[in-house]
């Protein structure tokens, strides 16, 4: 699931 990839990016802001 690529969701975890970009999700960490937005949440890591």
UniProtKB/Swiss-Prot annotation:
Tissue specificity remark: Expressed at low levels in roots, stems and flowers. Accumulates in nodules at a high level.
Induction details: Accumulates in response to Sinorhizobium meliloti inoculation leading to nodulation. Induced by the root-knot nematode Meloidogyne incognita at the nematode feeding sites (NFS), and accumulates in subsequent root galls.
Keywords: Nodulation
Origin: domain of life: Eukaryota
Phenotypic effect of disruption: Reduced nodule number after inoculation with Sinorhizobium meliloti SM2011; remaining nodules are abnormally spherical and contain a few small rod-shaped bacteroids, their development is impaired. Bacteroids development is arrested at stage II-III and they undergo premature senescence in cells of the fixation zone leading to the formation of vacuole-like structures as a result of symbiosomes fusion. Reduced mycorrhizal colonization by arbuscular mycorrhizal fungi (e.g. Glomus mosseae and G.intraradices).
Gene Ontology biological-process entries: arbuscular mycorrhizal association; nodulation; organ induction; response to nematode; response to symbiotic bacterium; response to symbiotic fungus
UniProt KW Isomerase keyword: no
Keyword Lipid biosynthesis: no
InterPro entries named in the record: ENOD40
Functional note: Modulates the action of auxin, and may function as plant growth regulator that alters phytohormone responses. During symbiosis with rhizobacteria such as Sinorhizobium meliloti SM2011, in response to Nod factors and under nitrogen limitation, involved in nodule initiation by inducing dedifferentiation and division of root cortical cells (primordium formation), and essential for bacteroid development during nodulation; this processus is repressed by ethylene.
Additional remark text: Enod40 mRNA triggers RBP1 translocation to cytoplasmic granules from the nucleus during nodule development.
Protein name from the UniProt record: Early nodulin-40-1
Species: Medicago truncatula (Barrel medic)
Lineage, top ranks: Eukaryota, Viridiplantae, Streptophyta, Embryophyta, Tracheophyta
């Amino acid at each position: 699931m690529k969701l975890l990839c970009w999700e960490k990016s937005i949440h890591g802001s």
